[in-house]
UniProtKB/Swiss-Prot annotation:
SUPFAM superfamilies, alphabetized: ITPase-like
Similarity annotation: Belongs to the Maf family. YhdE subfamily.
Cofactor(s) this protein requires: a divalent metal cation
Coiled-coil segments on the chain, per record: none
Pfam families for this protein: Maf
Organism placement in taxonomy: Bacteria, Bacillati, Bacillota, Clostridia, Moorellales
One GO cellular component, as annotated: cytoplasm
Gene3D superfamilies xref list: 3.90.950.10
Record keyword Nuclease present: no
Protein name in UniProt: dTTP/UTP pyrophosphatase
Amino acid sequence: MSKLVLASASPRRRELLARLGLPFTIQPSRIDESVYRHLPPAARVEALALAKARAVAAGLTDALVLGADTLVVCEGRVLGKPDSPAAAARMLAFLSGRTHTVYTGVAVVQAPRGPEGVTHARTAVTFRHLTPDQIEAYVATGEPLDKAGAYGIQGRGALLVAGIEGDYFNVVGLPLVQVEELLAIFGVDVWGRV
């Protein structure tokens, strides 16, 4: 098997990929994400995941590079990572009592410029009706500040969620079924290594 490289600095993606039992290294990508803003959410996360994987793959040989990107969309509005506690509070107030969609694109590229595979997952998440005190308390934990949509379902943010429809791991940031399916296309047998 070629060396597996995760093109992400996300600790959540690192933890999730480790669940597959495959050895991998981490090499975060650096791309200009703004050039993809015009694309609809599913196409955007796929394009960004592929761009991230390609950027890292270009500097490697004999490696499979996994890229990913996640967006939160509510009522047509894309919610990225908040840039301040106040922005996080505004996002959470907006999400309160609503259903939003989490999209994660996943791409695998055979380095340096070999075959590529890309897909995405989509999960609907419904928030509870949140009080201003609940929002303030959650923001005070610091948890929402580095996450798209200003919450982490795998942490205390789970208390904000009334329900989900779809892949939980997608909401965390890496849909493992799609990752396994893409890696299988490149000859990686996750089941044989667990």
